[in-house]
């Protein structure tokens, strides 16, 4: 974002670096320029509960940024090499007030985040494994991907089957089996580096009622 040039600090973050812990008091607004940050909580039994991810253009922690909490609700941990921009909350909010067009973009961003969250919740409500996975793929397409060719959405993070298992509550073995079927059916294509979702094939599997044509521009990219 051009408005932030000159007022932000860029940090290169190594993989598996914890940026914020649950309960921390943040010192600045963080914006993902590249890479991916996992957002999660740790339950009383020590189990990790994935809440979502932050990819290029996302900010965190949102509740603190906009004054709705005094500390963080989640852990924020990089899942790959990432570039993170940091800026003071005061400077960030002043820029939004001075530039209404940018404020509108952030309003759009919050709607995007909310929509993604609703799709995530819907995935957990599904009875069958394949339906849970299809909804998570829909979530990834809406929330964490870019359309590089018509109907071809490239996920902005290294989407592993263990990640899908963590988001759905399914076993890794079940995810591996179902993802293999979806790959053969042309819904997805993936390798060690890239993960592609084909919108029309996903729409066909989900059905017209479950699939909405949702478009959001990313804040940064």
Task: For each feature predicted by the language model, list its residue ranges.
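Short loop/turn microsegments at loop-to-beta-strand junctions
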Residues: 8, 26-27, 155
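Residues that recognize and position ribonucleotide moieties
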Residues: 11, 30, 52, 77, ...
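Polybasic "coupling" helices that flank or enter modular domains
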Residues: 101-167
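Long cytosolic regulatory regions associated with cyclic-nucleotide signaling
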Residues: 63, 109, 132, 215-221
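Phosphate-/nucleic-acid-contacting segments
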Residues: 142-221
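Short proline/glycine- and basic residue-enriched helix-capping loop/turn segments at helix->loop/beta transitions
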Residues: 1-15
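Cyclic nucleotide-binding regulatory domains
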Residues: 17-80
């Amino acid at each position: 974002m051009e408005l932030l040039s000159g007022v932000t600090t860029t940090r290169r973050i190594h993989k598996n670096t914890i940026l914020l812990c649950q309960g921390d008091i943040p010192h600045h607004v963080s914006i993902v320029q590249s890479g991916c940050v996992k957002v999660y909580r740790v339950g009383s039994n020590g189990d990790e509960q994935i809440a979502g991810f932050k990819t290029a253009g996302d900010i965190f922690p949102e509740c603190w940024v906009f004054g709705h909490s005094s500390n963080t609700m989640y852990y924020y941990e990089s899942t790959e090499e990432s570039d993170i921009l940091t800026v003071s909350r005061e400077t960030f909010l002043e820029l939004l007030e001075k530039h209404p067009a940018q404020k509108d973009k952030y309003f759009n961003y919050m709607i995007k985040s909310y929509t993604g969250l609703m799709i995530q919740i819907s995935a957990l409500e599904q009875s069958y494994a394949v339906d849970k996975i299809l909804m998570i793929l829909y979530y990834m397409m809406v929330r964490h991907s870019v359309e590089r060719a018509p109907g071809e959405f490239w996920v902005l993070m290294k989407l592993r089957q263990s990640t899908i298992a963590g988001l759905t509550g399914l076993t890794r073995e079940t995810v591996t089996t179902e993802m293999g079927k979806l790959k053969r059916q042309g819904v997805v294509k993936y390798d060690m580096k890239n993960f592609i979702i084909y919108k029309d094939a996903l729409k066909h599997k989900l059905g017209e009622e479950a699939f909405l044509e949702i478009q959001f521009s990313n804040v940064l990219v």
